[in-house]
């Protein structure tokens, strides 16, 4: 009897380990991508849709807001990364079809237009949310937003607009707000993932953002990565932190892990 019981326990442990290993080593789903044309008034836009091919019905969606270059190869790379988690990702086109920056000299005025007109910025991002919810693979009740740099500002503005999403995640985004009282409209969880040495996000902006979140009773979290500057998720930013914008592998991996953990918390049975 004792041998039988011991053997049963060994089998149970072995089975548990095998199951755990199977989950840990499960292959990510294959992903597909396509562009989606849509309009706001008479203006045309072209977003990027990247989604998992799972055959399991509807999946949670991610509204992605691009960096100041516009929808680009970097946007696609990050969208594919998220889609491999079993999420359908729509990268909204803030600028308009065919309007893409070729370099910082183009990006600065493009991004500046929307940083200076938050109402227009919100309208562009909110329209993208509508397009995402229209996709047949997407569960419209399970949506988060994620943005990078300029796009990080965009997803926080989406939250300030009172959008009905579960969470917004800003990767090295701008935190300032010309209308901090709009924090009272936030329904979503707000996650800000920042580089400790980002020269483009001032200490005063961080303090004001935190005060906005506190006084508005938002469910929020800020994580600061030591040694990281602006654009820490973008390999194309180079490795020279002295420029103020550079890739940082540790911050990139840890921030994506933070995003992954949030998805697991919000959608445990996706």
What are these regions (language model features)?
Residues 1-12:
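Bacterial N-terminal signal peptides that target proteins for export
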Residues 35-137, 233-246:
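Serine-hydrolase catalytic machinery in alpha/beta-hydrolase-like enzymes
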Residues 78, 202-212, 221:
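Short alpha-helix in the alpha/beta-hydrolase fold that links the catalytic acid
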Residues 125-186:
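Primarily recognizes the serine-hydrolase "nucleophile elbow" in alpha/beta-hydrolase
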Residues 185-190, 216-219:
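Short, proline-enriched alpha-helix->beta-strand connector loops that line the catalytic pocket
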Residues 192-194:
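Short beta-strand/loop motif that positions the catalytic acidic residue
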Residues 197-201:
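Acidic catalytic loop of the alpha/beta-hydrolase fold
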Residues 214-270:
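C-terminal catalytic histidine-bearing segment of alpha/beta-hydrolase fold enzymes
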């Amino acid at each position: 009897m004792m041998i039988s019981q011991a053997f049963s326990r060994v089998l149970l442990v072995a089975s548990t380990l095998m199951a755990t290993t199977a989950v840990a080593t499960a292959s990510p789903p294959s992903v597909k991508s396509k562009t989606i044309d849509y309009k706001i008034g008479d203006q045309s836009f072209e977003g990027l849709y990247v989604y998992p091919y799972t055959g399991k019905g509807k999946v949670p969606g991610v509204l992605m807001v691009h960096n100041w270059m516009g929808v680009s190869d970097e946007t696609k790379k990050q969208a594919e990364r998220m889609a491999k988690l079993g999420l359908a990702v729509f990268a909204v086109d803030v600028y308009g079809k065919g309007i893409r920056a070729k370099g910082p000299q183009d990006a600065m005025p493009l991004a500046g237009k929307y940083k200076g007109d938050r109402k227009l910025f919100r309208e562009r991002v909110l329209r993208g949310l509508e397009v995402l919810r229209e996709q047949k693979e997407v569960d419209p009740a399970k949506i988060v937003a994620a943005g990078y740099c300029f796009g990080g500002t965009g997803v926080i503005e989406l939250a300030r607009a009172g959008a009905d999403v579960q969470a917004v995640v800003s990767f090295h985004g701008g935190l300032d707000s010309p209308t901090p009282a709009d924090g009272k409209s936030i329904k979503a969880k707000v996650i800000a993932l920042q580089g400790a040495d980002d020269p483009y996000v001032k200490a005063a902006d961080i303090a004001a953002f935190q005060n906005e979140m506190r006084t508005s009773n938002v469910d929020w979290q800020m994580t600061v990565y030591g040694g990281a500057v602006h654009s820490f998720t973008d390999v194309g930013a180079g490795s020279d932190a002295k420029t103020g914008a550079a890739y940082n592998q540790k911050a990139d991996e840890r921030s994506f892990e933070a995003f992954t953990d949030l998805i697991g918390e919000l959608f445990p049975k996706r």
